[in-house]
Amino acid sequence: MTNQKKKEMVQTFQNKFEKKMQELNLDFNRVDLYQQAFSHSSFINDFNMNRLDHNERLEFLGDAVLELTVSRYLFDKYPELPEGNLTKMRATIVCEPSLVIFANKIQLNDLILLGKGEEKTGGRTRPSLVSDAFEAFVGALYLDQGLEAVWQFSEQIIFPYVEDDELDGVVDFKTQFQEYVHRQNKGDVTYRLINEEGPAHHRLFTSEVILEEDAVAEGKGKTKKESEQKAAERAYKILKNKNA
């Protein structure tokens, strides 16, 4: 492809990028960093550019920055969870499927600079390519604006993923609640199924968690296990608030 084509692609990128940063309410100084973050190796190869001008180094940095940011968030949000649980949660957030979800939330793949062949073969929607670009963007944002800007971005795009219970099954709230009760010497914990309704293919279970002889909270779920997890999560929050 010609240099004129390259100029057109870069100009289009810059226009889209500026608009995207306005939408995200993020400041930026070094457009060149972000251009590199969205430059796939196929784009670099098509125009015979420096082989290190693609986004893989920024992807490397962004991965580390994401792990740090998410680690701090989980550390603060779940003060009673042991290291093993936090590690599992972080791995669920900082992984290809989740990063693709985050990128698609804000149509970040529309900014990726691709070579002609990669574009034709569907590279713009390829999960590995999209997740790599997301990490590279975070790396560029960190270099340009610092960790605080990455935190601000994460509050918009990443942390709600946790707040909206997208991590069900990773956090064992029954264990978390049991350990908390044990530390507080509150007594014995039991669970009781109090309702089961709906057709066989779409059952809804309601369970309650009982501390000593008192019902603390209820939870609903598609399985008995899920309803107990929900009840434990609510009970844990209730007790923590009482003891705060």
UniProtKB/Swiss-Prot annotation:
HAMAP family: RNase_III. This is Ribonuclease 3. Digests double-stranded RNA. Involved in the processing of primary rRNA transcript to yield the immediate precursors to the large and small rRNAs (23S and 16S). Processes some mRNAs, and tRNAs when they are encoded in the rRNA operon. Processes pre-crRNA and tracrRNA of type II CRISPR loci if present in the organism. Belongs to the ribonuclease III family. The gene is rnc. It comes from Staphylococcus saprophyticus subsp. saprophyticus (strain ATCC 15305 / DSM 20229 / NCIMB 8711 / NCTC 7292 / S-41). Its main location: cytoplasm. It is an enzyme of class 3 (hydrolase). The active site is at 63, 135. SUPFAM superfamilies: dsRNA-binding domain-like, RNase III domain-like. Keywords: Cytoplasm, Endonuclease, Hydrolase, Magnesium, Metal-binding, mRNA processing, Nuclease, RNA-binding, rRNA processing, rRNA-binding, tRNA processing.
